[in-house]
């Protein structure tokens, strides 16, 4: 099973409670503990200017899209061993779908 369109409103709540402490969404909001997510879709791992990534993130070499985010958000440390993202992941596929649907709308 892979990505399916989710509920952006539920994704917004997930972002607020699970992601917003470390990430921003809009252009120019800048990096926090984690990199700014503006322009996320179609971007390569480890490529946000001014953010200090681990070598693991820089060398992963994948492009963020629905499918890569769906897999990554289940267990970030398994998908990119050595990442400094201190997030255990979203185990429920529905939660990942909701969050990815929200991110696609809000990071353009």
Curated annotation (Swiss-Prot):
What the entry lists under InterPro entries is as follows: Cyt_c-like_dom, Cyt_c-like_dom_sf, Cyt_c_1A/1B
* PROSITE patterns reported for this sequence: CYTC
Keywords associated with the record? Electron transport, Heme, Iron, Metal-binding, Mitochondrion, Respiratory chain, Transport
Positions that bind heme c = 19, 22-23, 85
Name one matching Pfam family.
Cytochrom_C
User: Which Gene Ontology terms cover its molecular function?
Assistant: electron transfer activity; heme binding; metal ion binding
Where found in the cell?
A: Mitochondrion intermembrane space
**Highest taxon of the lineage:** Eukaryota
Q: How is it modified after translation?
A: Binds 1 heme c group covalently per subunit.
Q: What is this protein called?
A: Cytochrome c
Q: Name one GO cellular component term.
A: mitochondrial intermembrane space
Q: What does this protein do?
A: Electron carrier protein. The oxidized form of the cytochrome c heme group can accept an electron from the heme group of the cytochrome c1 subunit of cytochrome reductase. Cytochrome c then transfers this electron to the cytochrome oxidase complex, the final protein carrier in the mitochondrial electron-transport chain.
Question: Can you tell me which family this protein belongs to?
Answer: Belongs to the cytochrome c family.
């Amino acid at each position: 099973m892979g990505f399916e369109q989710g509920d952006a409103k539920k994704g917004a709540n997930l972002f607020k409670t699970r992601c917003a402490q470390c990430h921003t969404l809009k252009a120019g909001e800048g990096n926090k503990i984690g990199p700014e997510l503006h322009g996320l879709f179609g971007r390569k791992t480890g490529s946000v200017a001014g953010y200090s990534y681990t070598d693991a993130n820089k060398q992963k070499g994948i492009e963020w899209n629905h499918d890569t985010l769906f897999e990554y958000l289940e267990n970030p440390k398994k998908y990119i061993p050595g990442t400094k993202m201190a997030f255990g992941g979203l185990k429920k596929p529905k939660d990942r779908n909701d969050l990815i649907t929200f991110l696609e709308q809000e990071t353009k």
